[in-house]
Structures are given as structure tokens and as C-alpha cells.
Amino acid sequence: MLRSMLVVLALLASAPAFAQVQPFPPGFATREIAVNDVTIHVRTGGRGPAVVLLHGYGETGDMWAPLAADLARDHTVIVPDLRGLGLSSKPKGGFDKKTQAGDVLGVMDALKVDTADLVTHDIGNMVGFAVAAQHPERVRRFVLIDAPVPGVGPWEEILKNPLLWHFRFGGPDMERLVAGRERIYLDRFWNEFSADPKRFTEASRQHYAALYALPGAMHSGFSQFAAFDQDAIDNRAMLAARGKLAMPVLALGGEKSFGPMMAAVMRAGASNVTEGVVPESGHWIMEENPAATLKLVRGFLESGR
């Protein structure tokens, strides 16, 4: 652990743009929470009903700073880095989303949070779905943003999209191929999945590229995708055994990305789905149109109070 922290500090010191990403408000604290076989890096702030924000691939919990700053006015905001990503520890396995749901629930338990709203993006959607499907009593409202969930709806058709070739890209040789070229690899995601790549700023690119260059981080990223087949099996089994999610769900798609299809897909896995579209945005909603995203998320959360 000490060696890993020294590596992190060295990277921070050598990357001048690292601090240019919007910071969390001064009232937020960070802590490391030991859960299962990992240590999860968590940011917390605010006071009120709890809301958990889960990031996806190509980013970390840092993506949520603008939303967290607003929600902290009347919520307790909890922002973890997923296992293996950001400043969380880097295990060799456990990247199926049922296991990662256990990480999230463990964080909630450590913070003495019984129930929470979930706001999730990309792979965070998949972890959040596993939380909500296994423990619906702990999720009040659920916002999923711009990524499908394995095994839910037309998953096999979605996999045929040529833009999603990275779902099958991984393994030791692929890790060697990308090692030292993390920025080049990640630029492909930030460019191809943006409505306007310029909105994913150079500061953000340097920030996340440095985090994904940490030892074990790219292995963790590839492992998130490698687990999709098992995730699909698990999700189909949970839906067959327990039925669709019953809590209110907001399915948001970027206008230039999933758009209204996000809600159409999620209706296969949830019975109370509200459709939402983030205008003038591709996949990276917090970089491309944070104001509209914030308005849609806050409006949905407030409708349940």
C-alpha cells in the first residue's frame, strides 16, 4: 500500500494539469474504506438524504464534482472510486458487477447509510443495477446515464455495434500494448463518444490519463469489460427470480449518444422508468453539458421528496 501511495504522489507531482479538474467543495472529506478484499477511495460531503454517485470507464469519481457540489446543499453525497480505478486499491479480480455491488453496499454500511438514491454513469450503471436488483430495499430512486446494462433488453444486438469493439479488447497482451500509451487509448473514447471532443478538456484528459497509468489500473479497466458475459448471466438470473426493478428509475441518454433509447432499453429491466435526454451531449454528460445533467438529476430526485 505504501509503495502504491508513493507512486500516486509521484504522478501527481509530475502532472501539472492534475489539479485543474474541478475540485470537490471544501466541505468534502476523503477516506479509505476497507470492504471485502479492497480499499475503496470515497469522497463524502453535505447533509440530508444520502445519494451515491458511481462513475464509469475513462473517468473516476472526480467526474461528479459539479453535481456533488450542487447536491451537497441538501443531500449527503457519497462518491466512491470503483474497485481497481482511481485511488481505490487494485485487486486482481472481483470485477463482476455483483461483487462490486457488495463494495458499494459495504461503503454504505461503513458510513451507516441504510438507504440512498443512486446516480450512475457508464459502468457505474451496471454496478448500480446489481445493487438495486439484489437489495431494492436500500435504493430509493435510481438514475442511470448513457450506457446499457449487460443482459437487459437487446443486449446481444447492442454488442454488434462496431463502436463497441473495446468490450472484447483485453488480456495480458493488450495490457502490454497499451502500457505507456494510456492517453492514446483513452483519447479514442473521449473523442469518439463526445458530441464535441473539445468539451472533454485537455486538463481532464491529462488528469484521467495519469490515474489510468497507475499500476494495475488498466488491468482493472479491461477486467471491467471482461466480466460482461458473467454480468449478463447474473442480471438475467436476477430478473427471472425477482422481476423488474420497482423503484422509480430515470434513464438519461446523451442526445448524440443513446438518447431516448436509454429509457427504451431500461424498460426491459425496470417497471417505473422516466425518459430523459441530455441535450447537445454525447456520452460524457458531465463534461459536455453539466448544467442540463444537473437539472435533470435534481428534478428527478426532488420529485420523490
What are these regions (language model features)?
Residues 38, 44-87:
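Conserved HGGG/HGGXW glycine-rich cap/lid loop of the alpha/beta-hydrolase fold
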